[in-house]
Curated annotation (Swiss-Prot):
Record-listed Phosphoserine modification sites: 161, 374-375
Further facts: Acts as an antigenic peptide recognized by cytolytic T-lymphocytes in a melanoma.
InterPro entries membership: MUM1-like_PWWP (IPR035504), PWP3A_3B_4 (IPR040263), PWP3A_3B_4_C (IPR048795), PWP3A_3B_4_N (IPR048765)
Entry GO MF terms: nucleosome binding
The keyword Transcription regulation is annotated on this UniProt entry: no
Polar residues bias (residue ranges): 375-385
Domain of life: Eukaryota
Quaternary state and interactors: Interacts with TP53BP1 (via BRCT domain); the interaction is not dependent on its phosphorylation status. Binds nucleosomes. Interacts with trimethylated 'Lys-36' of histone H3 (H3K36me3) (in vitro).
Organism of this sequence: Homo sapiens
Protein's name in the database: PWWP domain-containing DNA repair factor 3A
Function of the molecule: Involved in the DNA damage response pathway by contributing to the maintenance of chromatin architecture. Recruited to the vicinity of DNA breaks by TP53BP1 and plays an accessory role to facilitate damage-induced chromatin changes and promoting chromatin relaxation. Required for efficient DNA repair and cell survival following DNA damage.
Biased amino acid composition, Low complexity: 128-137, 288-297
Keywords: DNA damage, DNA repair, Nucleus, Phosphoprotein
Intracellular or extracellular location(s): Nucleus
Source species taxonomy: Eukaryota, Metazoa, Chordata, Craniata, Vertebrata
Length: 710
């Protein structure tokens, strides 16, 4: 318990596997005795607890298996599924830790032995194992095969702890009774036994031999593999030398953790308890003696993309002849096959010498080699055919058939653009200025001149002619201009058809000016579009501006809105505040009504007729004018009733013709700080209009006159 790293402790009414973190001692009432506590951490959880050393047990594989069997026998559904999953995961981690710990202990023992032997620098003697002890006590007749019905499990031993040279050493000889010496290449790949054999009707056994890659250091080192079969071993010195000279390599797959602990070969030094003994997981490779040249030897199996290897295509002949399969368990879930690993089936042994047997070619191996190669080629062709079929199924249609809307606008493109109150109309892009994000477009209409200048519009207001909203835009245009938009679409369609047929190559404007478009252009009725759509493309032909370089256009000036009216309204607002809020003109108005001050506007009102058609108000904003008039009505009710009775005039006319001018003139004089006479002249002159305001007013008069004439 003092050295245990993993224990079983009780936590939350269950036995949980845990890892020991620390050990502490606590004194009790009896000073001679101390209580030991363990600080442990539950596996697969971050929970850390403190338990007594007397309440824990050392973690063993048998305990985990017992707990797992009890969980499997439960028929009730667990109350807390998440807790149950965490408990099962902890048990699984504990089982993996125990399995990995056994493998690490074997590898560490083999590594220490290997380091000791490398320091000595001398050939190591044969290391005894349970398999060797059994082989030394058996008679020779049992080794070479007997006709007894009793079968023993083949015991395969792989050495990972000895390395020596035997190419030129005369003492490097193997006694058939003692077994083979073991050697290991520290830098070579891990080589493990591929499997065992079974006894046939004649009593002979099939031997499976393993070869390792020869490591040449200084030109005099070779590697040897040991074989323990029924407790006996055969000599393989000559074949090992051939292997070292040719540099061949046959490696076996790694072994899963499925070997019983009581198996004597499982406890042998250097044995990996990962793969069941006697199992063969890859197609056999031919004898090295059967290859006359290195190029004739079959290549290693090519690994798949997912790291696995192809399964063997044919069954082994000894198995088909009635040989019993290996009694070892099947490959477990931890089985892994390296891409460089293959297995080899050796020839059946005889009473003759082993060296003479290996020098002869094996027909079964050659036949099996050809079958494996043919099966591999057929599988390769089938996989290639399946890949091609999948590519054909995933083939996409040509990109020409798929329309992708372009992201930018270029010269000559057909677009949609909305002109004022009219719907979106087809147009042609004449020029693009990416820096200003502007484009010049020319509308497609009945009397379009390709040499005319277009309208400069923003790129954001344009839409490609084949956009997603094309049908919607067409329907909106057909509501008021069905015949006109139909002619535009037919012209564009004819242009695209001629481009596709190859009868015309050029831009849309070139097509419109060419004779090839005349049949479509002549179908338009006289002035059909001109009467409904304005002359959008009016202007002079594009010519270089005088004083500018050839071909360079005069920069387009941005037309700002007219702000003259807004400026006058802000100035008049000061006059309104002076009259209404400050009541600065009230004393002046009272003096006029009481005849204390002479008034030009009062004299004109008294001497003029009652019918006046036009009144100059000076104030342009109706809201400002309403405020001033309401204020003047209050002043008139207080003072001007007697004057109105004397004159028998209209109250509204009196306010507009007398009080309003006097109040505005008084406000101008006070705000602008001028005398009364100058303020009166400014009032009579009225607001100063800008040139653009006069032009707009004149155009409105002309439109009104034309409308009346129609």
């Amino acid at each position: 318990m003092a050295d245990a790293k993993y224990v079983l402790c009780r936590w939350e009414k269950r036995l949980w596997p845990a890892k020991v973190l620390a050990r502490t001692a606590t004194s009790t009432k009896n000073k001679r005795r101390k209580e030991y506590f363990l600080a442990v951490q539950i596996l697969s959880l971050e929970e850390k607890i403190k338990v007594k050393s007397t309440e824990v047990e050392i973690l063993e594989k048998s305990q985990i298996e017992a707990i797992a069997s009890s969980l499997a026998s439960q028929n009730e559904v667990p109350a807390a599924p998440l807790e149950e999953l965490a408990y099962r995961r902890s048990l699984r981690v504990a089982l993996d830790v125990l399995s990995e710990g056994s493998i690490w202990s074997q590898e560490s023992s083999a590594g220490t032995g290997r380091a000791d032997r490398s320091l000595r620098g001398k050939p190591m003697e044969h290391v005894s194992s349970p398999c060797d002890s059994n082989s030394s006590s058996l008679p020779r007749g049992d080794v070479l095969g007997s006709s007894r019905p009793h079968r023993r499990r083949p015991c395969v031993q792989q050495s990972l702890s000895s390395s020596f040279t035997c190419e030129k050493d005369p003492e490097c000889k193997v006694d058939h009774k003692k077994g083979l010496r073991k050697s290991e290449n520290p830098r070579g790949p891990l080589v493990l036994p591929a499997g065992g054999g079974a006894q046939d009707e004649s009593g002979s056994r099939i031997h499976h031999k393993n070869w390792t890659l020869a490591s040449k250091r200084g030109g005099n080192s070779a590697q040897k593999a040991s074989l323990c079969l029924n407790g006996s071993s055969l000599s393989e010195d000559d074949t090992e030398r051939d292997m070292g000279s040719k540099g061949g390599s046959w490696a076996a797959p790694s072994l899963p953790s499925g070997v019983r602990e009581d198996d004597p070969c499982a406890n042998a030094e250097g044995h990996d308890p990962g793969l069941p003994l006697g199992s063969l997981t890859a197609p056999p490779a031919p004898e090295p003696s059967a290859c006359s040249e290195p190029g004739e030897c079959p290549a290693k199996k090519r690994p798949r993309l997912d790291g696995s290897q192809r399964p063997p295509a044919v069954q082994l002949e000894p198995m088909a002849a009635g040989a019993a399969p290996s009694p070892g368990p099947g490959p477990g879930p931890r089985e892994s096959v390296t891409p460089r690993s293959t297995a080899r089936l050796g020839p059946p042994p005889s009473h003759a010498s082993a060296d003479a047997t290996r020098c002869l070619p094996c027909p079964d191996s050659q036949k099996l080699e050809k079958e494996c190669q043919s099966s591999e080629e057929s599988m390769g062709s089938n996989s290639m055919r399946s890949i091609l079929e999948e590519d054909e199924e995933d083939e996409e249609p040509p990109r020409v058939l798929l329309y992708h809307e372009p992201r930018s606008f270029e010269v000559g493109m057909l677009v949609w653009h909305k002109h004022k109150k009219y719907p979106f109309w087809p147009a042609v892009v004449k020029s693009v200025r990416q820096r200003d994000k502007k484009a010049s477009v020319l509308y497609i209409e009945g009397h379009m001149n390709p040499k005319m200048k277009g309208f400069t519009v923003s790129l954001k207001s344009l839409k490609h002619f084949d956009c997603k909203e094309k049908q919607t835009l067409l329907n909106q245009a057909r509501e008021d201009f069905n015949q006109d938009i139909g002619w535009c679409v037919s012209l564009i369609t004819d242009y695209r058809v001629r481009l596709g047929c190859g009868s015309f190559a050029g831009s849309f404007l070139e097509y419109y000016a060419a004779d090839i478009s005349y049949p479509v252009r002549k179908s338009i009725q006289q002035d059909v579009l001109g009467t409904k759509l304005p002359q959008l493309s009016k202007g002079s032909p594009e010519e270089p501006v005088v004083g500018c370089p050839l071909g360079q256009r005069q920069p387009c000036r941005k037309m700002l809105p007219d702000r003259s009216r807004a400026a006058r309204d802000r100035a008049n607002q000061k006059l309104v505040e002076y009259i209404v809020k400050a009541k600065g003109a009230e004393s002046h108005l009272r003096a006029i009504l009481k005849s204390r001050k002479p008034s030009r506007w009062l004299q004109t009102f008294l001497s003029s007729s009652q019918y006046v058609t036009c009144v100059e108000t000076y104030l342009e904003d109706e809201g400002q004018l309403d405020l001033v008039v309401k204020y003047l009505q209050g002043v008139y009710q207080e003072v001007g009733a007697k004057v109105l009775q004397r004159t028998n005039g209209d109250r509204i006319r009196f306010i507009l013709d007398v009080l309003l001018p006097e109040a505005i003139i008084c406000a101008i004089s006070a705000v602008d700080e001028v005398d009364y006479k100058t303020a009166e002249e400014k009032y009579i002159k009225g607001p100063s209009l800008s040139y653009r305001e006069k032009e707009i007013f004149d155009n409105q008069l002309l439109e009104e006159r034309n409308r009346r004439r129609r």
